[in-house]
């Protein structure tokens, strides 16, 4: 027994089998082949029941919030607008009460105006900050442009201002040439052979050849 154990210990252990990896084709085939769809743990009827329950809870919450707002509004109105006691009041007392009510209305209007001014200011600041953010990001908001028909003269007038007339008057910058000068140039060009003969001294020889 001891010899067998010693022989087993002396022999080299066999190498483990190499792990076979799937090729790209195998992975592609595995991805494209149909697999059994996993069944959902919740049935369709159970899902419908849960959705209905969630909608009912949301509806109850909205109704509760609306009731709380109505109650809060009633409490505020009861504290600020107390019922008037007009029994046993004389003419002068009624006038004093009307003056007090008018003064309270004026005060409320002033407060409302101040609140509206603050809201308008905040809206303007928010719009300015939003535009600055767009500018920093490089996203410029395009303004709404209207199509306007305009002539070329009006466009040049708008672009150049007082220089529009000067730029449009192109003939003023051209050199004026008289008709007499043009005829003179044509006459000189037409007699170029005579001029060449006179300059070259060939007029006598030409007569000999012609004779």
UniProtKB/Swiss-Prot annotation:
PTM note: Phosphorylated at Ser-23 and Ser-24 by PRKD1; phosphorylation reduces myofilament calcium sensitivity. Phosphorylated preferentially at Thr-32. Phosphorylation by STK4/MST1 alters its binding affinity to TNNC1 (cardiac Tn-C) and TNNT2 (cardiac Tn-T). Phosphorylated at Ser-43 and Ser-45 by PRKCE; phosphorylation increases myocardium contractile dysfunction.
Protein name: Troponin I, cardiac muscle
Gene field: Tnni3
Region (Involved in binding TNC and actin): 130-151
Keyword set includes Lipoprotein: no
GO terms under biological process: cardiac muscle contraction; heart contraction; heart development; intracellular calcium ion homeostasis; regulation of cardiac muscle contraction by calcium ion signaling; regulation of muscle contraction; regulation of smooth muscle contraction; regulation of systemic arterial blood pressure by ischemic conditions
GO cellular component: cardiac myofibril; cardiac Troponin complex; contractile muscle fiber; cytoplasm; myofibril; sarcomere; troponin complex
Annotated stretches, region: Involved in binding TNC: 33-80
Entry keywords, A to Z: Acetylation, Actin-binding, Muscle protein, Phosphoprotein
Lineage summary: Eukaryota, Metazoa, Chordata, Craniata, Vertebrata
InterPro entries named among the record's database cross-references: Troponin, Troponin-I_N, Troponin_I, Troponin_sf
Pfam families per the UniProt record, alphabetical: Troponin, Troponin-I_N
Species whose genome carries this gene: Rattus norvegicus
């Amino acid at each position: 027994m001891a010899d067998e154990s010693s022989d087993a210990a002396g022999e080299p252990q066999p190498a483990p089998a190499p792990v076979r990896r799937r090729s790209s084709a195998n992975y592609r085939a595995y991805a494209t082949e149909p697999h059994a769809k996993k069944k959902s743990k919740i049935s369709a009827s159970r899902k419908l029941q849960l959705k209905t329950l969630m909608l009912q809870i949301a509806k109850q919450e909205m109704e509760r919030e609306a009731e709380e707002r109505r109650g809060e509004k009633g409490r505020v109105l009861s504290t600020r607008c107390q019922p008037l006691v007009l029994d046993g009041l004389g003419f002068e007392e009624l006038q004093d009460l009307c003056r007090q009510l008018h003064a309270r209305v004026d005060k409320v209007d002033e407060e409302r105006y101040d609140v509206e001014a603050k809201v308008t200011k905040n809206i303007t600041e928010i719009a300015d900050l939003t535009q600055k953010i767009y500018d920093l990001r490089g996203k410029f908001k395009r303004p709404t442009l209207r199509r306007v028909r305009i002539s070329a003269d009006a466009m040049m007038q708008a672009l150049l201002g007082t220089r529009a007339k000067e730029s449009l008057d192109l003939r003023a910058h051209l050199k004026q040439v008289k008709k007499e000068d043009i005829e003179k140039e044509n006459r000189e060009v037409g007699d170029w052979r005579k001029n060449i003969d006179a300059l070259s001294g060939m007029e006598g020889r030409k007569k000999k050849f012609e004779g």
